[in-house]
Amino acid sequence: MSWTRVVVLSSLTTLLILTFSSVVKSAAVRDDSKAGDPKGAARHVFMPESDASNFFKHRSRRSPRYYSERQAEQRVRLSANERRREYNEEQRNEFENYVEEERDEQNERSREKNEQVREYHYDGLYPRYHWFH
């Protein structure tokens, strides 16, 4: 029970110190009247009413899109498809080259190994049918 009193008292004193300190005054929002022009700030944030109504009129769900907008979206889609196709083709070519090189190396290793085995087991009789005795 005593430790809760200590915690509560320390938090209350900290809160009291922070409310009356000068550091908090500088961090608080100022109430002076010489703040920036509110109309200028609103002008940067909001657009005129006519532009906003035109924007929503053109962008509503039911309004048809313009032909040029459709064409532009189609061009963007086609160019993205072309880039994806080229990238996939490049990746496929690189993989095919890698597989071909690996296959060639594997064939070379197995051929060398077969030649070594053949040389090791050769007993001087060359026609092949003499090998099996």
Curated annotation (Swiss-Prot):
Cellular location of this protein?
Secreted, Extracellular space, Extracellular matrix
Q: Where is this region: Disordered?
A: 57-116
Q: Name one GO biological process term.
A: embryonic skeletal system development
Record flagged with keyword Oxidoreductase: no
Give the originating organism: Dicentrarchus labrax
Q: What does this protein do?
A: May be involved in the negative control of osteogenic differentiation of osteochondrogenic precursor cells in peripheral zones of fetal cartilage and at the cartilage-bone interface.
User: Which positions does the record annotate as the modified residue 4-carboxyglutamate?
Assistant: 69, 73, 82, 86, 89-90, 94, 96, 100-102, 105, 108, 112, 115, 119
InterPro entries attached to this UniProt entry? UCMA (IPR031386)
* PTM annotation: Proteolytically cleaved by a furin-like convertase to generate a persistent C-terminal fragment found in almost the entire cartilage matrix, and affecting osteoblast differentiation.
Signal peptide: which range, if any? 1-26
Indicate what this protein is called per its UniProt record: Unique cartilage matrix-associated protein
Pfam families reported in the protein's UniProt record? UCMA
Q: Which UniProt keywords apply?
A: Coiled coil, Extracellular matrix, Gamma-carboxyglutamic acid, Secreted, Signal, Sulfation
Task: State the superkingdom.
Answer: Eukaryota
Sections of the chain in a coiled coil: 88-121
Propeptide residue span(s): 27-62
Compositional bias per record (Basic and acidic residues), positions renumbered to this chain:
67-95, 106-116
Family statement drawn from the similarity comment of this UniProt entry: Belongs to the UCMA family.
One GO term of the cellular component aspect? extracellular matrix
